[in-house]
A protein has these predicted regions:
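Short pre-active-site segment immediately N-terminal to the catalytic Zn-binding motif
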Residues: 55-71, 90-96
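Active-site metal-coordination segments of metallo-dependent hydrolases
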Residues: 87-102, 110
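Contiguous, non-catalytic segments that form substrate-binding/exosite surfaces or channel walls
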Residues: 1-65
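Long, well-structured alpha-helical subdomains associated
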Residues: 93, 106-165
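Active-site recognition of the HExxH zinc-binding catalytic motif
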Residues: 70-83, 101
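Extended, non-globular alpha-helical segments
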Residues: 28-52, 69, 131-156
């Protein structure tokens, strides 16, 4: 057995952390989305997944609260982006779809003041092989982020508007 506290663990081991009102945001999103969400005990490497045919998201119940929220945003990005591609799903590769989903999740989290950069930036870089492809996917990311942002509690939206006005 080891001694010490979790502040001595690297971020990737202990999971994403933040001082966000996790439960309010999560409850609001779960009440508004048109896809089922289930929380299950999974291995530590798997944070969640979106099953397109079942129209369902599964999230690892072992995730930290913030990683749960980030994963929900990532899987919702898959849901909304794939739904918007009706008739042209073959246009995007698996790598590009992962890039869109994680970029969207990262941007939504950043808007909420949640820093997921230690996790998200390397993940995004892993999937980005072609800068030209990024330019083509930018609009898809913007649309996907917009759809997720509409799910946030009004007080979060107002906080974000106030932040934007100060900039």
């Amino acid at each position: 057995q080891t001694e010490g506290d979790d502040t001595q663990l690297p971020t990737m081991i202990k999971g994403l952390q933040s001082q966000v009102d996790y439960s309010t945001i999560l409850d609001r999103i779960l009440a508004k989305i048109d896809v089922s969400v289930d929380f299950k005990d999974m291995n530590y490497e798997q944070h969640g997944f979106y099953a397109i045919k079942e129209h369902a998201i599964t999230i690892n119940s072992r995730n930290s609260p913030v990683h749960t929220l980030k994963t929900l945003f990532h899987e919702l990005a898959h849901h909304y982006h794939l739904d918007s591609l009706k008739g042209r799903r073959d246009k995007f590769t698996y790598e590009q779809e992962e890039f869109v989903a994680e970029s969207s999740a990262y941007l939504v989290c950043a808007t909420l003041g949640i820093d997921t950069g230690d996790y998200s930036i390397p993940y995004i870089k892993h999937w980005l092989n072609d800068f030209q492809a990024f330019q083509e996917m930018r609009r898809d990311i913007e649309k996907t982020v917009g759809k997720i942002m509409k799910l946030l509690p009004e007080e979060e939206e107002q906080t974000n508007k106030n932040k934007e006005e100060k900039i």
